[in-house]
């Protein structure tokens, strides 16, 4: 089993004959919730199977999957940011719903073949269940995590206008084409233009900005929990160790700009609803500020739980939705 570690940036201790599942991503060991949720169910079932976080570099994904295809004890598992789109080209089969959404968050191994599925769509439907009719919706981000959220929103709010904030307009156009979005939508690349639009009724953050996790890039670290999606993260300054005060001090100017952008955004904007698909922390900086200004907020916990239940069912061939949900929530 030690051979698995050749492809990872973290070290896993898995017994030689133990069946296991993985959550594959850049740094799932730094805060992914799925291992805790899945392992609660495995323990309740008195199973020896466990889920582990697999931190993988982009250039090692193909090698890892080739190894897992021939790894008899690997069952499948989850895929998290930022590989939900990239990983598709290395899989043998893609479920038709995942193909339409254009991203994969679940892998199932059958014999020596790996198949991709997407359960984020079900999670997205759960996340927006309490959100009522909307006139104009602002979507922040257009990555793999955004796709199922956008699909569920455009299906529920068919008469709403959508504003996409993303620096790459072609990415949005391709996404709209692939998801067959019929809604009226605009693309805004400039943050200043977003700050000047007054009549949003719902703001949805599908980016990872706000997530509490130390990320390593070129031997240096940064954490996105201190920022909102209104930050210019191109200017972020990294540090050599997980020193929170040092990181904040080094990014004073960026944090100040972020604060000014937030203040401008919330000025004269009452009664906006905010959905942030991030679940760690429960209240991101964006949600805390939105709540402070008296707006209704929703986090990504329900979305994350629902997708985890559905993924567990697919990988482990189980139909016990209520049992799995109960064990994931109650830890017993």
Regions found by a protein language model. Give the residues of each.
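Helix N-cap at the beta1-alpha1 junction of Rossmann-like dinucleotide-binding domains, i.e.
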Residues: 29-30, 169-170, 281
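Active-site capping/gating segments
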Residues: 126, 275, 279-286, 293-318
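Short glycine-rich anion-binding loops that position phosphate/pyrophosphate groups of nucleotides
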Residues: 79-86, 144-145, 207-212, 280, ...
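Phosphate/diphosphate ligand-binding glycine-rich loop within oxidoreductases
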Residues: 2-132
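Conserved S-adenosyl-L-methionine
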Residues: 155-161, 292-296
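C-terminal helix-to-coil terminal segments
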Residues: 1, 7, 44, 300-332
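Glycine-rich adenosine-cofactor-binding loop
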Residues: 25, 118-121, 128-129, 134-156, ...
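Rossmann-like adenosine-cofactor binding region
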Residues: 183-297
